[in-house]
Amino acid sequence: MAFKCNEPAVPTLQQEDKTVRITRWDFAPGAATGWHTHSWPYFVVMLTDSVMKIEAPDGAVSEVQRKAGECYQRPAGIEHDVMNGSEHPMAFIEIEIKRPEELVRAK
């Protein structure tokens, strides 16, 4: 089940080609992405200090404090809904690696 929210998070595509997709996500307080699955491994770079609430497929909700500039990565196949649990806007950049083999230079 997805978080109940009055407003969805806003994705803004920054760059996309055959190897990567880079998206900026902006969340008003209480906004959520909606339930989704990541097809590719991805990295997140936080743009704001925030409280991120994450709902897992089993319904468990975790609450994580994130700092601006903090980064983390996750593998492909992650299923979740992400909500801004802060009282202020939350933003991050998501970098999805669509074809990692093409990012490696031939020797």
For each predicted feature, which ranges?
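Histidine-centered metal-chelating micro-motifs
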Residues: G30-T33, G69-M83
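Short histidine-centered beta-strand/loop micro-motifs
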Residues: T12, W25, T33-H38, E55-A56, ...
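Glycine- and acidic-residue-biased ligand/ion/polar-headgroup-sensing regions
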Residues: H38-D58
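A short glycine-rich, His/Asp/Glu-containing loop-to-beta-strand
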Residues: C5-W35, P41-V44, F92-I95
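Short acidic-glycine-tyrosine-enriched beta hairpin
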Residues: Q15, D58-G77
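Extracytoplasmic/periplasmic copper-protein system
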Residues: L103-K107
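Ligand-binding loop in jelly-roll beta-barrel domains
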Residues: A76-P100
